[in-house]
């Protein structure tokens, strides 16, 4: 089976639960301590029960130092492509390349 030219990575994909935001952050920290490679969250800006994805990724990145952060679902119809690209690029710069 092909390896597609890159290492297999493992990550955590917590639900960005607005009712329990500290739990999401605890899970992200635990993912890093456990040696996982990535923490990724969903982008559903129209759902009141979910935290804003970019804000959440910023806080996760601030509380960790090695895991990469990413969206696992980007809601393109509700995100201007230029603004989305700038958000991703800014977070990548601020995290030292962890996006």
List where the protein language model places each region.
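N-terminal beta1-alpha1-beta2 module of alpha/beta enzyme domains
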Residues: 1-64, 68-72
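Flexible, glycine-rich active-site loops centered on histidine and acidic residues
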Residues: 4-21, 78-99
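Conserved strand-turn element in the central/C-terminal portion of the radical SAM core barrel
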Residues: 72-78
């Amino acid at each position: 089976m092909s390896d597609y030219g890159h290492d297999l990575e493992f990550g955590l994909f917590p639900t960005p639960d607005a009712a329990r935001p500290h739990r999401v952050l605890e899970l992200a920290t635990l993912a890093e301590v456990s040696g996982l490679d990535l923490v990724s969250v969903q982008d559903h800006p129209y759902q009141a029960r979910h935290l804003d994805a970019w804000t959440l990724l910023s806080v996760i990145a601030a509380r960790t130092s090695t895991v990469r952060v990413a969206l696992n679902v980007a809601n393109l119809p509700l995100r201007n492509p230029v603004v989305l690209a700038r958000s991703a690029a800014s977070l990548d710069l601020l995290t030292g390349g962890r996006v």
